[in-house]
Design a protein with these regions (language model features):
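Zinc-dependent metalloendopeptidases
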Residues: 1-134
């Protein structure tokens, strides 16, 4: 997984120093329960971003490869398969138009109202899609 998440604005609520650290923890959680497959992490990757580039890009963006975000969409996973259904790529894009942090426990409210989006919780969910779940 090519982590290209950039820096956080200081220490996150869970004590993590970066989005990459949180994403690596989420991937490690998946790895701890799998025996026939493992996620491999490339932190701060410089791989080109793009659907169809055979790299599993993980990044924040204001669009989904140029398309606007649907209302209230936190993140998307875009999977590409070959004609036999074999997965070739799974990109995870987080909506950077929203407020993010990383924390444990119940959902929290953001200072501007609404829910403070928990990056770790959403990353765990999206990485499940990379595996083909849901």
């Amino acid at each position: 997984m090519h982590l290209q998440l950039g820096a956080s604005n200081g220490t996150l609520l869970d004590g993590s120093e970066s989005w990459g650290e949180v994403a690596e923890g989420a991937l490690a959680s998946w790895n701890s329960g799998m025996t026939n497959m493992r996620f491999t992490v490339i932190r701060d990757s410089t791989s080109a971003l793009g659907y169809g580039n055979s790299a599993n890009n993980v990044f924040f963006s204001s669009t989904v490869y140029g398309e606007g975000w649907a209302s209230r969409t936190l993140a998307v996973t875009l999977s590409r398969t070959n004609s036999n259904g074999v997965r070739l790529e799974g990109d995870v894009i987080f909506n950077n138009n929203l407020s993010w942090n990383s924390y444990r426990g119940p959902l929290r409210s953001s200072t501007g109202g609404g829910t403070l989006n928990d990056f770790r919780r959403v990353a765990l969910h999206e990485f499940g899609h990379v595996l083909g779940l849901g």
